[in-house]
Amino acid sequence: SHEFGHYIVAKYFGYDTQIHYASTSWRYPDPNNPIVTGYPIAITLGGPIQTMFTGTIGIVILFLSRNSFFQADKLSFRQWFIIFISLFWLRQTANLCTWLGSYFVNGKLSSRGDEIHIANYYHLPNWTVVTTTAIIATLLLAIIIFKFIPLRQRGTFLSAGLTGGIAGYIFWLVLFGKYIMP
């Protein structure tokens, strides 16, 4: 859905667009028509805004139906689905972790990623957008985990989420994504 956020904005501005396994590419169909400089930043913003918007919808639904969560000893499929939608915010925390992780592995901070490009566009230090959104995400995730997930399911949720998140990253971004959606 993140890449679809880029795709929708690029299509809106008339670009030829393709979604790949880890990115969205766009080009203007008429090479003689200059690209307005504001469009690339709007397209870049489309992905993170879409992802955070989806997560925010989930959080709003969580709070609107909080009584059913507070009374539950074990969450229903519907409740887990709402939590899943809320966890779209997890991308922001994961981005900061992978950004810092690449520093510890490579000895330098990556200049790639939507949040870094957004910071550069607005002449902010590289860390500002990725760190600010990760802090917001971490606070929201703490509320989700400690307020809405019953204690008896919390440990399983955290261990399964961590294992699934790492496995999903490896399977999709490293191993199979490039073959399924080149």
Give the ranges of each region predicted by the language model.
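Small-residue-rich helix-interface/hinge motifs
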Residues: 1-40
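Juxtamembrane boundary at the C-terminal end of a transmembrane helix
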Residues: 170-182
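Helix-to-loop transition at the C-terminal end of transmembrane segments
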Residues: 1-3, 96-100, 178-181
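Tryptophan-centered motif/residue detector
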Residues: 9, 167-172
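Interfacial loop-to-transmembrane junctions
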Residues: 148-166
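Metalloprotease/metallohydrolase-associated module, dominated by Zn2+-dependent proteases
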Residues: 29-149, 169
